[in-house]
Amino acid sequence: MRLHLLLLILLLFSILLSPVRGGLGPAEGHCLNLSGVCRRDVCKVVEDQIGACRRRMKCCRAWWILMPIPTPLIMSDYQEPLKRKLK
């Protein structure tokens, strides 16, 4: 009986003290859903920046993907100002 108790306590401590890393952050998951890769600081030459993963990490996706995946755009009421015509 003591052996069972000892194993149970050992199992409990190993579960509580094990290093646990949480899942992906919401921005990282969104980047992966768009077939992107989180990169530090800059994207490669053949990639476009489609968002941000974390501080200093950018979501990059190759612009030449054979099966294009539309990147969701934020809808707003912003309109560009009218340009003046030169006389």
From Swiss-Prot:
Keyword field: Antibiotic, Antimicrobial, Defensin, Disulfide bond, Secreted, Signal
Organism (species): Pan troglodytes
Cysteine disulfide partners in this protein: C31-C59, C38-C53, C43-C60
Keyword flag Transcription regulation: no
A GO-annotated cellular component: extracellular space
GO molecular function: CCR6 chemokine receptor binding; chemoattractant activity
Signal peptide: 1-22
Top-level taxon of the source organism: Eukaryota
Compartment annotation: Secreted
Family: Belongs to the beta-defensin family.
Record protein name field: Beta-defensin 109
GO BP, sorted A to Z: cell chemotaxis; defense response to bacterium
Designated gene of the protein: DEFB109
Function: Has antibacterial activity.
SUPFAM superfamilies listed in its UniProt record: Defensin-like
Lineage: Eukaryota, Metazoa, Chordata, Craniata, Vertebrata
Matches recorded under InterPro entries: Beta/alpha-defensin_C
